[in-house]
């Protein structure tokens, strides 16, 4: 799997450096599972631009316009087995869709008009050992958002949702 993570890292760097419309590091946002994050250290993704898949209820990333979603999301197999044993259908693709949309909406997609927001700059360690986010107030406006999704399944789920055709 080292070959896979190296290949994915190279593809991610290629997206951020060559394909993205905005190549500034400050505009990047990416995610993967936390235990895979270590494989991307030193990449062009930038450690400061990582945003956990579970992050909710924040506007601090409203200036991010170049996104990379490095997850192929599935339910925990134990949860699926629990519901399956009770003849309850669990919507697997809808779960994946919900996660990717919620994560994407941490970015500039949530910006409807020009506004000021507090954006994340860095982590600061307080004297008592607490980790505190250092923010800066900036003006943002709606911009085009690009997203790199290497998983064919996740791309298809997202495309099918946005380009749903009732025919």
Feature map (PLM): residue ranges:
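Conserved RecA-like P-loop NTPase helicase motor core
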Residues: 44-165
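Conserved helicase/translocase motor-coupling segment
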Residues: 1-57
């Amino acid at each position: 799997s080292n070959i896979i993570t190296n290949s994915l890292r190279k593809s991610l760097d290629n997206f951020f450096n060559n394909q993205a419309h905005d190549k500034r590091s400050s505009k990047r946002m990416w995610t993967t599972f936390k235990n895979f994050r270590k494989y991307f250290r030193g990449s062009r993704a930038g450690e400061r631009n990582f945003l956990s898949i579970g992050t909710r209820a924040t506007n601090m990333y409203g200036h991010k316009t170049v996104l990379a979603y490095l997850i192929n999301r599935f339910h925990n197999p134990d949860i699926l087995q629990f519901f399956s044993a009770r003849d309850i259908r669990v919507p697997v693709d809808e779960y994946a869709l919900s996660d990717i949309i919620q994560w994407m909406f941490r970015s500039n997609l949530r910006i409807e008009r020009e506004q000021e927001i507090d954006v994340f700059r860095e982590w600061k360690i307080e004297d008592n050992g607490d980790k505190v986010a250092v923010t800066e107030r900036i003006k943002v406006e709606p911009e085009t958002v690009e997203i790199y999704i290497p998983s064919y399944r996740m791309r298809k789920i997202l495309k099918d949702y946005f380009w749903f055709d009732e025919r």
